[in-house]
Regions:
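Acidic-and-aromatic substrate-binding clefts and catalytic sites of carbohydrate-active enzymes
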Residues: 23-26, 42-52, 73-78, 106-109, ...
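Active-site groove signature of glycoside hydrolases
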Residues: 91-107
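Short, acidic/polar
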Residues: 24-33, 76-91, 139
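Beta/alpha (TIM)-barrel catalytic core signal, keyed to glycine-rich beta->alpha loops juxtaposed to Asp/Glu
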Residues: 3, 104-315
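N-terminal binding-site loop/beta-alpha segment at the start of enzyme catalytic domains
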Residues: 1-64, 94, 284-285, 295-313
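Acidic (Asp/Glu)-rich catalytic clusters
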Residues: 7-8, 54-62, 85-92, 121, ...
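Short, well-ordered coil/turn segments that N-cap beta-strands
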Residues: 11-16, 37-40, 61-64, 93-97, ...
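A short, structured active-site edge motif that brings together acidic residues
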Residues: 63-75, 98-102, 156-157
Length: 315
């Protein structure tokens, strides 16, 4: 498994991370992934999977890089603190490696939220601060609210069929030493990739390098040094397949051929598509208790797992 430096932290993490959005595989596939080198695990308070992740990393905490997210309905200062502490209990750990704002919340001052994040960092409860589904402008605002630490990552949708980050976000991340964490690197499964790849360029390249189509698609995604791809798989065999997408390199010609040959079928920014919907829902969910922070999905995302149970897919 290839390693990459996360943002400007100097810390190396696996270039393929295991995602747990709508994950139902239990402990074993996560542990298989860790053994396969995917020691970066991503979860969130709204996923309902933090407890499973905590069980999977029990006794091996120092070997893994654990990321979680605070939901936008918990962006008030005290709510951020309580949400983080709840995640720590669920994960059975005393610190998070990366804590991310899951979506922008336009009803709470960003400075208030970031002040709480900075306090968590000062107290050692989180090591690094990240964002998710933030635009370039929102990233700049978030960083401007921090006085002592830096934003190290932004998690957004990115794949062969959804390349919105190439319209400025990737360039900004590269210039500012921010890692782009790509969710849905396999789109919504092989069916979507097949429809976008009418000439079967993926199949041709896969045959050339002796890999599967999914492995080629993942390898294309992490070819950029600033990108880390987050895959999801409920079955151990699919986790192994995804982990084998790292440790080798496509040629520049193969990368270009894939970019030309696979058409874009999801070309609306996830931020543009869901941002306003999320903002409207925040008021509805604002009064919910932190006692059950994983009970609902406030992000409005659809499942991106393969139609086959546990197939190699992404968050």
């Amino acid at each position: 498994m290839n390693l990459k430096v996360l943002g400007a932290t100097g810390i190396q993490v696996s270039e393929l991370a295991i995602g747990t959005w709508k994950y139902h595989g239990g402990v074993e596939p996560l542990q298989v992934g860790i053994e396969g080198g995917a020691t970066f695990i991503d979860t969130a308070e709204s996923y309902g999977t933090e407890q499973t992740v905590g069980e999977a990393i029990l006794g091996i905490r120092s070997r893994v890089f654990v990321a979680s997210k605070v939901s936008p309905r918990h962006f008030r200062y005290n709510d951020v603190i309580r949400a983080a502490e709840c995640s720590l209990r669920q994960l059975k750990t005393d610190y998070l490696d990366l804590y991310q704002l899951h979506w922008p919340n336009y009803t709470v001052a960003l400075a208030e939220t970031m002040a709480a994040m900075e306090r968590l960092a000062d107290e050692g409860k989180i090591r690094f601060i990240g964002l998710s589904n933030f635009s370039v402008a929102e990233m700049k605002r978030a960083q401007g609210c921090l006085s002592r630490v830096r934003v190290v990552s932004n998690q957004v949708k990115y794949s062969l069929v959804c390349r919105d980050p190439e319209d400025g976000l990737l360039d900004y991340c590269k210039a500012n030493r921010v890692s782009l964490l790509a969710f849905s690197p396999l789109a919504t499964g092989p069916g979507v990739l097949a429809r976008a790849d009418g000439g079967d360029v993926l199949g041709q390249v896969a045959a050339e390098v002796g890999k599967t189509r999914a492995q080629v698609a993942l390898n294309w995604c992490v070819a950029r040094p600033e990108v880390i791809a987050i895959f999801k798989a409920d079955r151990a065999e699919h986790v192994r397949e995804n982990c084998a997408a790292s440790g080798w390199y496509l040629s520049s010609e193969q990368l270009a051929r894939l970019s030309r040959g696979v058409k874009l079928v999801q070309n609306r920014s996830a931020i543009e598509q869901f941002g306003r919907r999320v903002a409207r829902r925040l008021v509805q969910y604002a009064g919910r208790s932190l006692g059950n922070p994983t009970a609902m999905d406030v992000e409005g995302r659809t499942s991106v797992s393969d139609t086959r149970p546990g197939a190699p897919g992404s968050r």
